Amino acid sequence: MTTTEEAPKSPLFEAIDKNDTEAALALLKTKEQAAQRDPSGMSVLAAAAYRGNLTLVEKAIELKCDVNDKTDGTLYTPLMFAALSGKQDVCRLLMDSGARMYLVNGIGKTASELAAFVGHHECVAIINNHITIDVIEDLLRPKVNGKYEGAEEYPDELAVFIHSLCGSHEIHPVKIIFRFSKYPDSLKYKKKILYVIDRVFEKQLRCKESNEIMSLKLWLILFSMRETSKFVESNKEKSPEEASLQYAKLISTWQEGDETRRALDVMLRNAVASFPYKHSLLHDTLQKALQKSQIGERPSAYEYIVQALFGQRIAAVCQFCSVCGHPGAKKRCTQCKLAYCSQECQKFDWPIHKKVCSFLKTRQEVSPTDETAMSLDDIQAQIAKIDV
């Protein structure tokens, strides 16, 4: 934002611009101070979000700054500035505090669209897939006249665990299984976990601002949780952690001659096929896209799903872990260059990977822009019409 000599910025805004957190906090102690605007019309919260300063954003929200305030002239909101700064934690905090993702600026762009334009694809995913923990709490412990009257008490950790599933943009089945295995009470509270996820899922297409992308994402998570729970319950001789990790290895198997993990491919295709809202435009176009490749061939079902949910651009610029699908995988097999996000995933996959490493080394990676292999123009054109 530019200013004129006749209208200099206040010391508070000067401190925010310099990212001098200590100085800014000393000048930001009252609601009156938090209500200031700089000469361009930017609020204190917007300026802090633009600088990606989480501490100052927290303080401004504490002092009751409007998280949906629009900067004079440009109509930019704090969430839009956070999206431009690329600060994922600031985006998440603003949305947890009530920032609305559907607001548009002076040129009709949402925060998500601005983040995508400047290449902050993790912020795009966070904004488009946000669910507050309050939503989980309300379903886990519904209150009557402000008081929970349920027969069973649930630990706070359960709400945090369910929120970590619903609020994340990571939908890979193995990632879901890893989370299941690390939460000690996954099986104990299985029914409640599945119930809450199912209720959040159902709300996505039954509200005023229906969200097809969120609906499909939650369905994939719910499907993985159900399948994992079934497997763990059918292997009672093992601990829930052991059984769930065995299931993860089962769906991660890779046979020589296949370009993808066949069992995982089948599972994801079944998940998409079983999506209950068949009238969904997103579901219909994704189903058609999946028919373009055979099971075990590239592009995999996961590649199609990622592009459908998060856009073709994020799939092109992010390297996904070959085990859990985590974006930004930086580790590589020295021989075949298969990507991993961590030593944990690499170690987990080694008994499987060592059998196909030589085969994968001889395979040339299929280009995602190869029209004969993967052309998602149709699905992207349809997704572009969906208001998300």
UniProtKB/Swiss-Prot annotation:
ANK repeat locations: 40-69, 74-103, 107-137
Binding site for Zn(2+) 2: 333, 336, 353, 357
Zinc finger regions, MYND-type: 321-357
Keyword Repeat carried by entry: yes
Deleted gene: phenotype: Fails to localize guanylate cyclase gcy-12 to sensory cilia.
Residues engaged in binding Zn(2+) 1: 321, 324, 341, 345
Record-level GO BP terms: chemosensory behavior; dauer exit; microvillus assembly; negative regulation of dauer larval development; positive regulation of cGMP-mediated signaling; protein localization to microvillus membrane; protein localization to non-motile cilium; receptor localization to non-motile cilium
Xref: InterPro entries: Ankyrin-MYND_dom_contain_2, Ankyrin_rpt, Ankyrin_rpt-contain_sf, Znf_MYND
Keywords: ANK repeat, Cell projection, Cilium, Metal-binding, Repeat, Zinc, Zinc-finger
GO cellular component, one term: non-motile cilium
Annotated localization: Cell projection, Cilium
MF (Gene Ontology): zinc ion binding
Keyword Zinc-finger: yes
Entry comment describing in which tissues the protein is expressed: Expressed in many ciliated sensory neurons.
PROSITE patterns named in the record: ANK_REP_REGION, ANK_REPEAT, ZF_MYND_2
Record function comment: May be involved in the trafficking and dendritic transport of signaling proteins, such as the receptor-type guanylate cyclases gcy-12 and daf-11, to the cilia. In ciliated sensory neurons, required for the calcium flux to the cytoplasm in response to onset and removal of a nitric oxide (NO) stimulus and is thereby required for the behavioral avoidance response to NO-producing organisms like P.aeruginosa.
Name of the protein in question: Dauer abnormal formation protein 25
Lineage: Eukaryota, Metazoa, Ecdysozoa, Nematoda, Chromadorea
